[in-house]
Amino acid sequence: MPAFFVTGTDTEIGKTTIAAGLLHAARSAGLSTAAAKPVASGCEPTAQGLRNGDALVLLGQCSLALAYEQVNPLAFAPAIAPHLAAREAGVELSAARLHEAVREVLALQADFTLVEGAGGWRVPLLGRENLSDLARLLALPVVLVVGVRLGCINHALLSAEAILGDGLALVGWVANVVDPATSRLEENLATLAERLPAPCLGRVPRLEEATPAAVAAHLDLRPLGIGL
């Protein structure tokens, strides 16, 4: 069943917003959905344990019954880079450990599954490992979320180059307009469309309420081989 790894050009560029929109679009098409965000920092303490807002959003778009711990098995309180948060907590943040956790979700064989990374493609894990090593172990096709703002062309092209260089397929990208005041917005988007070696799945404007349904209205899953 189709499964994809979602990465971004940076942190705070709307990966979860776009991932939730993609999941909503798949659910609206009658597909069963599942998701994983294997590691997250900046989690809030609750009576049930640490909870991450982004992971909860993804959980809300899963049609299959998943426990929070399946979606987000490694949660850390400090809002810092995951490898630093893990080090402070005395937790071994290895690609192999994250891989085992994600495989549990993939084994559910939902019609449409997303695995969302943290930050960008080269976020550090244990030792010399990066989050990209998890993506390589999973061997999933990649969807790149481009946070459209000043500098995004360089970030997007470098990310695409790294993804392809790691031997993975870049199967789509989404333009998420995080700064609508970006100079030469249309020309920047045209350059991205020309230079990125994958189809654009949609252009999401800055929305007053970026609900999964509102975001899904701007997305197209057909380039991923999912007919709607």
From Swiss-Prot:
The keyword Cytoplasm applies. GO terms for cellular component: cytosol. Its cofactor is Mg(2+). InterPro entries: DTB_synth_BioD, P-loop_NTPase. GO terms for biological process: biotin biosynthetic process. ATP binds at residues 12-17, 54, 116-119, 205-207. It comes from the Bacteria. It catalyses: (7R,8S)-7,8-diammoniononanoate + CO2 + ATP = (4R,5S)-dethiobiotin + ADP + phosphate + 3 H(+). Substrate binds at residue 41. Coiled coil: none annotated. Keywords: ATP-binding, Biotin biosynthesis, Cytoplasm, Ligase, Magnesium, Metal-binding, Nucleotide-binding. It is an enzyme of class 6 (ligase). Mg(2+) binds at residues 16, 54, 116. Disulfide bonds: none annotated. Pfam families: AAA_26. Its EC number is 6.3.3.3. The active site is at residue 37. One of its GO terms (molecular function) is dethiobiotin synthase activity. Its main location: cytoplasm. Homodimer. Belongs to the dethiobiotin synthetase family. Catalyzes a mechanistically unusual reaction, the ATP-dependent insertion of CO2 between the N7 and N8 nitrogen atoms of 7,8-diaminopelargonic acid (DAPA, also called 7,8-diammoniononanoate) to form a ureido ring. This is ATP-dependent dethiobiotin synthetase BioD. It comes from Pseudomonas aeruginosa (strain LESB58).
